[in-house]
Each structure stands twice: as structure tokens, then as C-alpha cells.
Amino acid sequence: MQDATFDQIFPTSQRCRSYLHWTPVDVAMRAVALLAPTRCRVLDVGAGVGKLCLIGAANTGATWVGVERDAEMVEIARRAADCMHVEHRTQFLHGDIRSIDWSTFDAFYLFNPFAEILAYGPADALTRRE
């Protein structure tokens, strides 16, 4: 499947981010094969709209958890999981990675999770947001 086809499940307002910020489908498929060859828990840091988690849940028996600080993206990811019928193998958390217990996961994925934060400048990137 091509990115443009997959991205149709997301709102038009978010699709413009795909080429720059979201994991391409071919990369996601390779990452899924490497991270979750068996039933395990995978954490996607800076999950955005959940593209990796959605692809992972659709193609493995693993549990995929995405953490994202943008509440709108978390809601979009949850709706996409429902649409794809993978909500039972995905969880999308609105929050900061510093509040996550990393010891409960078997694998981790970070694809460009800090690009948007760093674009605002170092001082703003270090400011804790609730």
C-alpha cells in the first residue's frame, strides 16, 4: 500500500504532515517486522496520528502504544484505530514521554519525534507542557 492511499483515513488537515513527519508505509512495515516478530508491547514515541501503531496492529499480534503530546493527533489516532478495527491492539496516550514507564515495553520506536518540537527553538522545546 502506498502512503497516499493509507493516509486517506486521516483528516485532510493532517495529511500535509505525512511526507515530512510520519513514518512511510514501507519503513513502517520493515520496523514492524523487526520490532514485533512475536506478541509483545511496542512503544511509539511521538506517535502523531498513530501510523506505525495502526500498521503494526493490523499486521501483528503485538500491542502497540503510541504516546503523543498533541491531543488532536491522539484523537485522530484513536478514530483511525476504530475505523481499521485494531482498537483492541492499540492504545494512544496524550502526554509526555517522561511520564511513561518504559520498563513495561519490549521494543521502542522513534521516527522523527522531536522535529516539530525543535523547530520552535531549544528553550521552547525544554518547556514542560501539560
Sequence positions of predicted segments:
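S-adenosyl-L-methionine
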Residues: 1-37, 76-103
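Conserved class I S-adenosyl-L-methionine
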Residues: 39-48
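Conserved SAM-binding loop of SAM-dependent methyltransferases across substrates and taxa
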Residues: 51-61
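Conserved SAM-binding motif I beta-strand of class I
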Residues: 63-68
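Conserved short alpha-helix immediately C-terminal to the canonical SAM/SAH-binding motif I
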Residues: 72-73
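A short SAM/SAH-binding and catalytic strip from SAM-dependent methyltransferases
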Residues: 106-120
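C-terminal substrate-binding/active-site "lid" region of AdoMet-derived donor-dependent transferases
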Residues: 117-130
